[in-house]
Amino acid sequence: MRVDGREKIELRHIHIHTNYLKHPEGSVLIEVGDTKVICSATIEERVPPFMRGEGKGWVTAEYAMIPRATEQRTIRESSKGKVTGRTMEIQRLIGRALRAVVDLEALGERTVWIDCDVIQADGGTRTASITGAYVAMVLAFEKLLQAEKVSKIPVKDYLAATSVGIVEEQGVVLDLNYAEDSKADVDMNVIMTGKGQFVEVQGTGEEATFSRAQLNELLDAAEQGIFQLIDMQKEALGDIVSHIE
């Protein structure tokens, strides 16, 4: 039994609140245990200069954490005048993952801005951001469809992410909270599509190594969790699912 009472291969309690914000074309508040992230999707009727005239769209992301999302207050990165390497890495990860399942040609020459703001952090903020951002993005695409600006919702598949790890006294566990993540021997983030294709796998031994057999076990656990997350995304999207499948 884990510190929060879960089984080893069990997700935290997940809730996806859709249309959480008034102004964005798509928005959600995703809760993964005590981790809470607001994800919004904004449609801009233009593309970056490097893509003009190509007839394709673009998806990009920004990620931030409010000062007291963590146990101790952290200084806003805007106060420092630059984003940290960690933030830049996460932003690129979110954008890259979403682009893997977006039909950029069907989107047309538009930019989708994804904003992920962590309001409470307890591990897995980047994976929660990806899972929530996908739903926010599809909600925004539904607005484009209703306005007859696109002929279909421009996504090719579902997308979700979770963490897995090896914690000494537990072995392989799914969806690590902060307490588990901080003492894990191996920490891994996995992003997959609804068809079971991998988009990204980030795995690191923390002063430890892991075997091929353990890697397979980690990926199996991640796959199980991600398919459950995708079912929750479908439930959150409701009737919009009929435009995707």
From Swiss-Prot:
Residues binding phosphate: 86, 124-126
Keywords per UniProt: Nucleotidyltransferase, RNA-binding, rRNA processing, Transferase, tRNA processing, tRNA-binding
Keyword hit for tRNA-binding: yes
Pfam families associated with the record: RNase_PH (PF01138), RNase_PH_C (PF03725)
Gene3D superfamilies in the record: GHMP Kinase, N-terminal domain
Catalytic activity: tRNA(n+1) + phosphate = tRNA(n) + a ribonucleoside 5'-diphosphate
Gene Ontology biological-process annotations: rRNA catabolic process; rRNA processing; tRNA processing
Entry's EC annotation: 2.7.7.56
GO MF entries: 3'-5'-RNA exonuclease activity; tRNA binding; tRNA nucleotidyltransferase activity
InterPro entries in UniProt: ExoRNase_PH_dom1 (IPR001247), ExoRNase_PH_dom2 (IPR015847), ExoRNase_PH_dom2_sf (IPR036345), PNPase/RNase_PH_dom_sf (IPR027408), Ribosomal_Su5_D2-typ_SF (IPR020568), RNase_PH (IPR050080), RNase_PH_bac-type (IPR002381), RNase_PH_CS (IPR018336)
Top-level EC class: transferase
Function comment: Phosphorolytic 3'-5' exoribonuclease that plays an important role in tRNA 3'-end maturation. Removes nucleotide residues following the 3'-CCA terminus of tRNAs; can also add nucleotides to the ends of RNA molecules by using nucleoside diphosphates as substrates, but this may not be physiologically important. Probably plays a role in initiation of 16S rRNA degradation (leading to ribosome degradation) during starvation.
Family label: Belongs to the RNase PH family.
Annotated PANTHER family: EXOSOME COMPLEX COMPONENT, EXOSOME COMPLEX COMPONENT RRP41
Subunit structure: Homohexameric ring arranged as a trimer of dimers.
UniProt-recorded name of the protein: Ribonuclease PH
